[in-house]
Amino acid sequence: MKTNLINKCAAVLLITICCNASLSAEAYANDQKIESFKAKDQYDVAYEFKPERMRYLLVSHDMDTGKKANAVLTTLGKDYLSNHKAAYLANIHGMPGIGRMFAIPKMKKYAHRIILGDDADLIAKFPEEVGKVTVIAISGGKVKSISYWSPGETALEDLLK
């Protein structure tokens, strides 16, 4: 009797896990509508990303790539992103608390706005190539194209035309 109950519980648990995995966010693709999202920037100021008002979204998935992207964005100036109707989202999900204690104050030194991606489901929606920043071109609130930028190796200006 106990074994039967344990087997049934295990089966229910397995089905639940499989269903949740299939419902998890899939990465955006061309012509797909991008969802609005809310997050905070490095100054702890609320930000709402509205894709219908933007032309580009840059997403760094790891700290090393983010550092390289921030170095390039700093040289381009504070208004470069806003002048190109672009936003920059840095993945901080999974960063340990002690890391945040040091990383976020460093981010405050950058003049450009850094949207802090602290939601695993949000970050999972953006395709990734290791060591590169995802650059999503947006038109009418939909993905127009997806490209990848290697900060310090290729010019961002070539992607944000």
Region roles according to the model:
Residues 49-66:
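Short active-site neighborhood of thiol/selenol oxidoreductases, capturing the structured segment around
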Residues 19-34:
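N-proximal helix/coil linker or "cap" segments that precede and/or mark the start of modular domains
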Residues 37-54:
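A short beta-strand-turn-helix
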Residues 10-21:
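Bacterial N-terminal signal peptides
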Residues 65-106:
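Structural microenvironment flanking redox-active thiols in thiol-disulfide oxidoreductases
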Residues 87-89, 103-130:
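Short, internal strand/loop/helix patches
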Residues 1-8:
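Positively charged n-region of N-terminal signal peptides that target proteins for export
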Residues 50-52, 118-156:
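Thiol/disulfide oxidoreductase modules built on the thioredoxin-like
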